[in-house]
Amino acid sequence: MDIGSNEILVASDYDRTLASEENNFVISPIVSQKVNEFSKKYKFVVVTGREKKFIDKLAVGLKPTAWILENGSLILFNDREFVLCEKSWFERDRKKIIEILDNLKVRYSIGRIILYVDGYGSKLDMLSEIEKYGRIEVNRNDAMILPKGVDKGVGVLKFKELTGFKGKIIALGDSENDYALFRVADIKVAVANAIPQIKEIADIVTENPNGLGVVEILDKILSGNFGKEVDIY
């Protein structure tokens, strides 16, 4: 069954989904070529916790429909930028969080919007005071601090609103911060290297890991076979 171009949106995580850790998260030509081919017919968005400056270096040549960066807080689409948080985040909340991190002597980096705390995924008790001002999200052993009410799923829903998209969402992911992405998906796909908790809630687990798992799904959609295996409607 051929699926119409306005009927589906594929939303994919980046690290350990589109790009592998073994390749230092640099997108492979095979994956980027397939995504670019797919994006000419269907909507394909990359939904990642990463900042633009890193994506620009890692994903050279990748041309999705849109980028949803910093865990859903920043959308780049049609040469426009959409920030998904209130002014109070910059004027008050983020400043207070930085003060707390400095007092705890925790190392962090500041993105355009969110804060990154590497290696603190298992030490959330130390960061509990931060939850008065923002939301902590763990991804494997790292933690990201976001404005309240923002996550990958919120970013995807905002993109739907911006484009007037009414079709089905197919989400691909591998780890904890993809729970929010799966929450808004009609079909949830875990790549073969995903953590067990993500595989358990997925509708499909790919045979191949990382980007080859994404290619596997895109090929099925392009060939018309995806609709035969999964009830997209």
Curated annotation (Swiss-Prot):
PANTHER family: HAD SUPERFAMILY HYDROLASE-LIKE, TYPE 3, PHOSPHOSERINE PHOSPHATASE. It comes from Saccharolobus solfataricus (strain ATCC 35092 / DSM 1617 / JCM 11322 / P2). One of its GO terms (cellular component) is cytosol. Transmembrane segments: none annotated. Keywords: Carbohydrate metabolism, Hydrolase, Magnesium, Metal-binding. It is an enzyme of class 3 (hydrolase). Its EC number is 3.1.3.18. The active site is at D13 (nucleophile). It comes from the Archaea. Substrate binds at K152. Signal peptide: none annotated. It catalyses: 2-phosphoglycolate + H2O = glycolate + phosphate. This is Phosphoglycolate phosphatase 2.
